[in-house]
Amino acid sequence: MGMGLLLLTAALLLAAYNLWCDKAAGDSSERVLEQLNSDIQENINMSLPDLPSGESLEEAYIPDYVLNPEMDMPQEEVDGQEYSGVLTIPALSLDLPVIGEWSYSNLRTAPCRYAGSVYLNNMVIAAHNYRSHFGRLKDLPQGEEVIFTDMDGNVFRYRTAEMEILSPFA
């Protein structure tokens, strides 16, 4: 009986720790997101050209990434961490900052750019399955919009095509 009680206590402590990590990650993401959204808006305002009379923004402005898709994604530093942009999934009411470089410790804070670049259409974003991060992705139906906004304010829109859940040991 003592061993059973010990195991039950350990399980409860582990569950409490996981919930605490989830909340801490969510709180951190919210705080960083506020700063990044402000930085993105500031970057947009600084980079907009003066438009000739009668010309639309789309006609007058070609983003740097179109001219040079191999360029590094711009980063913004918040609390000593470099971020690549913001991931938005409207169907899940999810807005998350994306850290520019993947590591296990970074995953505890926010989703991370695991590999690739949004400019080359091969970016992979990794995140924990915290409810405040990617924990609800399994509920995302096919055809839903996923938006990534880089730190220059360029918006990239996608639709989910299929859902694949990988083994934790893949």
Task: Describe each model-derived feature in a short phrase.
Residues 2-170:
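Solvent-exposed, non-transmembrane regions of membrane-associated and secreted proteins
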